[in-house]
């Protein structure tokens, strides 16, 4: 439209310019000359309009080209958007989609840092965590195989119904695996036991994404040395230093929603203990292999003892038969309950009770060069609220306050004095003793064999799922 108006204006100017020229051609104007002039003007006016039209056509052509290019760009962007949707990398339209895609690409899938600091739940944003080692159940006493469980539709449905529970265990187990791998990269002689425990626990809290009673540490880090087999963690002021000739049992736990992973291993620097570690690891794996639905607990203990006692170890020129520590054992695990009632012996005898479908067990074995029996020794550091205790009236305000702190932060999970210190508690020893005397809290002092002996431990958590047995804490290390 603008092009047409421009052409008309241009024609008017031509008329004004031509009038003087026409008048100069003659003084008298005849009708014929006037007609000629009129035709000439009309012709030139047409030419001007034609020129304007050409310009309009040119502009229209340019607009068409631009529109075509724009459509082409839009089609290309839509194609890119479709590709992004297929890859799950973007959900915007056109340029916005491209921008989103770039942003996501830049961020990428999260990977673990060194040292580990990214929570396990962030590494697996879909909420599905790595499974442990899945094993077929052992044959029954009459020789029948348990392979049918893996294909049974009923058992598959039951297994799927508890998937959320199994998944909580797997998240806690993955945190345990990554923490212990990290610990093995830096633990060395010369470090204090407090330094080792605090560094381990700090990492564990990050990976499990500690959140009150919903996620966190299941019990204090055990770092029992030499003849001490279990339940030692340093209290404030403990100056014990890890030595080259020490044999250290690292036993720590993680939990998600009270689903506890109880898993332990032994650290040594002197190769003279290698056979002792091999014996205990073999015994633990034997216990795991024998465990299963309808298996008697005493049969598991008998198999463990047989394997462990088949080993002899020479330390400093003296030969010892490796003995299982008879008054230590594995145990069933319940929600927020590390010892849920059933015990898995590591020697012949014990309960004839059977393992049941859906149960969770900590299979742990302890080997010793001493008597193979432990007793309470040293200062107590581990405590745990009694799971079955009812309401007990408390008079002392300090004791009441401490119980509230325990209920809010630990519930029925085990804790240690260092953790009370960390919460800002002070002068609590009398209140803690009072809670123990009332039976509300149980103390768990360090358990030791005779002085001069050496003890080792390995432990895994297993899930007795309807379809198979899952060694959920299994890793590449053990």
UniProtKB/Swiss-Prot annotation:
Its cofactor is Co(2+); Zn(2+); Mn(2+); Fe(2+). Substrate binds at residues 231, 339. It catalyses: Release of N-terminal amino acids, preferentially methionine, from peptides and arylamides. A divalent metal cation 1 binds at residues 251, 262, 459. Its main location: cytoplasm. The modification Phosphoserine is found at residues 60, 63. A divalent metal cation 2 binds at residues 262, 331, 364, 459. It holds the Pfam family Peptidase_M24. It is found in: Cytoplasm. Its EC number is 3.4.11.18. Residues 1-123 are annotated as: Disordered. GO terms for biological process: protein processing; regulation of translational initiation. Keywords: Acetylation, Aminopeptidase, Cytoplasm, Glycoprotein, Hydrolase, Metal-binding, Phosphoprotein, Protease. PANTHER family: METHIONINE AMINOPEPTIDASE 2. Belongs to the peptidase M24A family. Methionine aminopeptidase eukaryotic type 2 subfamily. HAMAP family: MetAP_2_euk. This is Methionine aminopeptidase 2. The gene is Metap2.
């Amino acid at each position: 439209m603008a092009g047409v108006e421009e052409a008309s204006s241009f024609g008017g100017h031509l008329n004004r310019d031509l009038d003087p020229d026409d008048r100069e051609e003659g003084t008298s104007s005849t009708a014929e000359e006037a007609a000629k002039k009129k035709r000439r003007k009309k012709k030139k006016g047409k030419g001007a309009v034609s020129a304007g039209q050409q310009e309009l056509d040119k502009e229209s052509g340019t607009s068409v080209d631009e529109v075509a290019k724009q459509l082409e760009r839009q089609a290309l962007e839509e194609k890119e958007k479709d590709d992004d949707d297929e890859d799950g990398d973007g959900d915007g339209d056109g340029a916005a989609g491209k921008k989103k895609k770039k942003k996501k690409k830049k961020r990428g899938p999260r990977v673990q840092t060194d040292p580990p600091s990214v929570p396990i739940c962030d590494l697996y944003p879909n909420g599905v965590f790595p499974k442990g080692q899945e094993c077929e159940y052992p044959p029954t006493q009459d020789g029948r195989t348990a392979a049918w469980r893996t294909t049974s539709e009923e058992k598959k449905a039951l297994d799927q119904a508890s998937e959320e529970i199994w998944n909580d265990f797997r998240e806690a187990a993955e945190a345990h695996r990554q923490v212990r791998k990290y610990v093995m990269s830096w633990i060395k002689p010369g470090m204090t036991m407090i330094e080792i425990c605090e560094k381990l626990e700090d990492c564990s809290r990050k990976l499990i994404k500690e959140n009150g009673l919903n996620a966190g540490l299941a019990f204090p880090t055990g770092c029992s040395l030499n003849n001490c087999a279990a339940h030692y963690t340093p209290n404030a002021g403990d100056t014990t230093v890890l030595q080259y000739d020490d044999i250290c049992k690292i036993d720590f736990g993680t939990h998600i929603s009270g689903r506890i992973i109880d898993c332990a291993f032994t650290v040594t620097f002197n190769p003279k203990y290698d056979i002792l570690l091999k014996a205990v690891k073999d015994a633990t794996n034997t216990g795991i292999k024998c465990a299963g639905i309808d298996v008697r607990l005493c049969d598991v203990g008998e198999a463990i003892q047989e394997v462990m006692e088949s080993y002899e170890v020479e330390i400093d020129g003296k030969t010892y038969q490796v003995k299982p520590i008879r008054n230590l054992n594995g145990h069933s695990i319940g929600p927020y309950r590390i010892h849920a009632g059933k015990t898995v012996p590591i020697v012949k005898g014990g309960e004839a009770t059977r393992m049941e479908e859906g149960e969770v067990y900590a299979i742990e074995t302890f080997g010793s060069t001493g008597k193979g029996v432990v007793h309470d020794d040293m200062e107590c550091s581990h405590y745990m609220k009694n799971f079955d205790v009812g309401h007990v009236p408390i008079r002392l305000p300090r004791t009441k306050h401490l119980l509230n702190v325990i209920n809010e932060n630990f519930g029925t999970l085990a804790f240690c004095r260092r953790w009370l210190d960390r919460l800002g508690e002070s002068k609590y020893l009398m209140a803690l003793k009072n809670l123990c005397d009332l039976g509300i809290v149980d103390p768990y002092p360090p358990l030791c064999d005779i002085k001069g002996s050496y003890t080792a431990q390995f432990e895994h958590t297993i899930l007795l799922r309807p379809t198979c047995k899952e060694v959920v804490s299994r890793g590449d290390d053990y």
